[in-house]
UniProtKB/Swiss-Prot annotation:
Species, as recorded: Emericella nidulans (strain FGSC A4 / ATCC 38163 / CBS 112.46 / NRRL 194 / M139) (Aspergillus nidulans)
Composition bias, Gly residues: 236-255
Subunit structure: Component of the COP9 signalosome (CSN) complex.
Entry keywords, A to Z: Cytoplasm, Nucleus, Signalosome
Tissue: Present in uninduced vegetative hyphae, induced conidiating cultures and in both conidiospores and ascospores.
Protein name: COP9 signalosome complex subunit 7
Compartments where located: Cytoplasm; Nucleus
Superkingdom field: Eukaryota
Major localisation: cytoplasm
Amino acid sequence: MDQVHHRALDALQSFIALTDSSSATSPRYIASIITNATSSPHTYVFAELLERPAVQALRSPDTPAEFQSYLTLLEIFAWGTWQDYQQTPNLPPLSEEQARKLRLLTLLSLASTIKPLTYEALMTSLSLSAPSELESLVTTAIYSSLITGRLSPATNPPTVNVTSVAPLRDVKPSSLPTMISTLTAWEARCGSVISDIETEIAKIRADSAQRRQKEHARAVAIEKTLEKWNAEGGEQLQGGNPGQGQGQGQGGLGKNAGWKPRDLSTAMFERGFFGGGSNKREFDDDGYFDGGSSDFDQHGSGMDIDEGAGARASGARHSKRFLGKKS
């Protein structure tokens, strides 16, 4: 599409050079340049030609009325439509080439403003009497790279599906304030969206930092709890039977010697983390003492039965019944 725009600008340069020549002093001569420029098959933009002093001189009150209308005609080719030409009186008649050019330019404008582009709407806007005329015009626009699209005559209603339009229409000066207002409103909406996104990002980061802080505190608490359990287990084993634990050192077990804590859930159960006020029946089938000692119980498996609800609360010690093989 950009190549089409460049080609259109290049095609206009020869007509601009003619308006800048020393011979471009006659209104009739300028009107002839406008006619040739709007009839050329490769010219689609005309704003640069409109800005030339010789062309703007046609607006002078001293210019004959028959030539003043050529300036209006050039403005319609720059940013107007076929309907604008039909509704403006006293304009020069169009040649076949000019009529096809103006219809093509009008198709570009309609493709950017009307959705969907039905056959009926296009034929009315372009003053075409048959669908075949519209299809021929659209085909010319597609092969000239003015639009990208396809014809859909079998749909109900028949439509022209346009996906892209070449930037070949000039901007009308009076429409600039509206464009600026539209862009300003769009900028404000973008700023609001960006502000909302930044606020959400800050919230996510704060939540993430808070979660990390909680996880760190939880990890520290667990580590301290495990250290406390290790210390308590070692202290309990220091008062063990000197006759046991041969090879562990004379006079009993040293601190933490031979103490192998089981998994965390078992340790937490033993320490009363899951509630110690209920009846407890614990059975060690592996023959190890419940106190954490690694010495094997020579008198059988250790089963301690703490009978009676509230036995822990009363503080009364119940004797353990050791069940196993008699020696």
